[in-house]
Amino acid sequence: MLLVDVAGASADVAASSARLAKIARIAELLRRAGREDVAIVVSWLSGELTQRQIGVGWASLRSVPAAAAEPTLTVAEVERRFGEIGATAGRGSQARRAQLLADLFSAATDVEQTFLRRLLTGELRQGALVGVMADAVAKAADLPAATVRRAAMLGGDLPAVAAAALTDGDAGLAQFTLQAGKAVGPMLAQTAADVTDALDRLGGTAMFEAKLDGARVQIHRRGDSVSIFTRSLDDVTARLPEVVEATLALPVTDLIADAEAIALRPDGRPHRFQVTASRFGRRGGTSDTASNPLSVFFFDLLHVDGVDLLDAPAHERIARLDAVTPDSQRVDRLVTSDPGAAQEFFDRTLAAGHEGVMAKSTVAPYEAGRRGAGWLKVKPVHTLDLVVLAVEWGSGRRSGKLSNIHLGARDPGTGGFVMLGKTFKGMTDEMLAWQTRRFLDLADGDATDHYVVKVRPEQVVEIAFDGLQTSTRYPGGMALRFARVVRYRDDKAATDADTIDTVREIYERGN
């Protein structure tokens, strides 16, 4: 299959707001893909490289060669080149990687260059989410969507499921079963406004758990063998020996469990998320165990000693979890129908330094790989009034509109602004239309000449965010987590915006 076919389908999917149209377009593409290309195409259209990371970002793509006149690149050839770029290391690797990248882009047409750029920078915003992609695979293979979704849930690898479905149909999907040692797509949570909202949505009674600001891990044990996977299903077993040790101490033979790994201070309060995250990076590992040990807290059980629990109600899974794990290695928990008791638990959890609570149905099954209605997260909302420093032209449905806004806090010391991140979340169609007009008026230079449009720092926007994290990308050393637009504040001048000192105060008190 030619790359131009994938790029064209991606553009069509991005331009459509209709779910069924997206599914039909992707399914049509998958039917035409060769069996060796299916998994690659599904990965790319899901916004992922099969290699995950190959060391290419926006900085590497600021200047690319002129586009080719005719499409010649195949999916297999581009995949091979991605692998070669990712494998480039050692002395002179930066120059070699740049040359390989230039060679690739010089062979790509304009539409292919656009697709490659967005794929490599994680900006492939086309609405081909996992649910859409799974349904497209089902349509292409003429299989029930539920069958494909369950295989993807158990296999934790939709591209592999797609390849099996398109090649061998039902028989191909039979290989995807729950097995210790084989990562499963984790169940995800929806959001509730507060604990009362959570209780209402869960039928009046809920199990509330402390939501730790650590790293979610899926722990597998087969006899004396332990495997640990991240939320994105990366194998990090070798980096977490203390979690392996804790798992081997449990009185079980086989197990698949959901847990949180977190770095704690001597007083039991959590370190900042970055301290925990440092153990999961490329440079993290066993050498950090003594200075930065992780504690493990289990919160769900998917399988134990030959018994699959995915379809069991939550109260049964938790009862089995409690039977095989010590109190000290389980998250704090409260089952209640009393909003007052739930709020007290929420407040106590925040006071302990954690980021919020999870509210869970006591009767819901474990919906692996899905954002199930049986799990709701409740977190405090922070807001800041920040100033827009620049805006990026959108793509897909947002093509022709100024979309992603760069956010800065006021610096009283210099009179300037310190960038804290960027977001396009929370924007309605009406807001996009308004801000396009507004920022074109504020543009500092030719707004059509660059992907990023610098603007005069005059527009104040109210931003909600979940917290702050350490960042080397921005000069203030901090970045907003999960920022989204609440509203534009035309009643405020840039001099009324929150200062970088205010942001630091939030950061220092643990968000």
Curated annotation (Swiss-Prot):
GO BP of this protein: cell division; DNA biosynthetic process; DNA recombination; DNA repair; DNA replication
Enzyme Commission (EC) number: 6.5.1.1
Catalytic activity: ATP + (deoxyribonucleotide)n-3'-hydroxyl + 5'-phospho-(deoxyribonucleotide)m = (deoxyribonucleotide)n+m + AMP + diphosphate
Keywords assigned by UniProt, alphabetized: ATP-binding, Cell cycle, Cell division, DNA damage, DNA recombination, DNA repair, DNA replication, Ligase, Magnesium, Metal-binding, Nucleotide-binding
InterPro entries to which the protein is assigned, alphabetical: ATP-dep_DNA_ligase, DNA_ligae_ATP-dep_bac/arc, DNA_ligase_ATP-dep, DNA_ligase_ATP-dep_C, DNA_ligase_ATP-dep_cent, DNA_ligase_ATP-dep_CS, DNA_ligase_ATP-dep_N, DNA_ligase_N_sf
Active-site residues, as the UniProt record annotates them: 211 (n6-amp-lysine intermediate)
Residue sites binding ATP per the record: 209, 216, 231, 260, 299, 371, 377
Necessary cofactors: Mg(2+)
Gene Ontology molecular functions: ATP binding; DNA binding; DNA ligase (ATP) activity; metal ion binding
A Pfam family annotated for this UniProt entry: DNA_ligase_A_M
Membership in a protein family: Belongs to the ATP-dependent DNA ligase family.
Function, in words: DNA ligase that seals nicks in double-stranded DNA during DNA replication, DNA recombination and DNA repair.
Protein name: Probable DNA ligase
Organism field: Mycolicibacterium gilvum (strain PYR-GCK) (Mycobacterium gilvum (strain PYR-GCK))
Gene: lig
